[in-house]
């Protein structure tokens, strides 16, 4: 896999030429985003959100099984990396996955790393 500097052309299709042409800026953004997603608790939050349109902080606390302050810290990290979007309604804050590409990535990670039970 060859990595090159910044290019002005659209990203190459690796299936066509076996290469990924990625800028240093894009590599940095991707690395930081994947690092944020890589924490087990944040990954659990993302899995919950991937299965719902949006979820309140209180519901995430109940489903994840940790304190609200801990959940809020992890949500803040994911929001800062623009992985999550939020909205406030009265005294509740709701979170959702902010980009459909993240949902696609979650599906790919599930297919690659998770055991799917056979029925």
Would you name each region that the model predicts?
Residues 2-29, 51, 99-119:
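Amphipathic alpha-helical dimerization/coiled-coil segments
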Residues 62, 73, 80:
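Alpha-helical residues within the helix-turn-helix
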Residues 80-89, 96:
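Beta-hairpin "wing" of winged helix-turn-helix
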């Amino acid at each position: 896999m060859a990595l090159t500097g910044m290019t002005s052309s659209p990203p190459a299709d690796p299936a066509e030429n076996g290469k990924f042409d990625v800028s240093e800026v894009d590599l940095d953004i991707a690395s930081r985003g994947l690092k944020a997603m890589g924490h087990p608790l944040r990954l659990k939050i993302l899995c919950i959100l991937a299965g719902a349109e949006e979820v309140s902080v209180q519901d995430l606390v109940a489903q994840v099984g940790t304190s609200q302050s801990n959940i809020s810290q992890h949500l803040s990290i994911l929001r800062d990396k623009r992985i999550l979007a939020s909205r406030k309604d009265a005294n509740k804050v709701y979170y959702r996955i902010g980009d459909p590409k993240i949902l696609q990535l979650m599906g790919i990670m599930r297919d690659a790393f998770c055991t799917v039970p056979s029925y």
